Amino acid sequence: GTLIRSLFHPFEEADKWPAVQQYLDILNENVADPKIALLGMQSFSSWLLFATAANACGEANDGVLTRECVLTAAADVDDWTAGGLHAPTDPGPEGGAAPPCGMLVEVNSDGEFERYFPEIGSSDDALDGFSCDDDSVVDVPANEGLGKVSPDQPI
């Protein structure tokens, strides 16, 4: 099957990760015939970040929310997991550095995701089912490929 790198715990492992199960429960309790997809969980993580930042602003400013306060509070977060939905990320003002943690999942013949790497609880499992290696992140200079492919294949 096809291997995919993921920063999010797969739905198929919801029994192991309470935040994923809570996300699925919220959908099933509040949405008729929910369409379970990773994009929804990514959006939920973004919403949780907004809610967390808005809550911090409300507490700091007697219940008053301003755009500037919410953006600043969100930018101050540098180890975001959405309560355990995904590996730690830095959603800072420039999107933060690429996260060094992830996992590989394989799409099986039924179209479901099966963990490929790391095995949970193994020495490769550095953090809640994710493998974390700072060497897995490399800087790619802007426009590195521009004009360097070949003259007959312009970008």
Residue ranges and their predicted role:
Residues 1-155:
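Extracytosolic ligand-binding ectodomains
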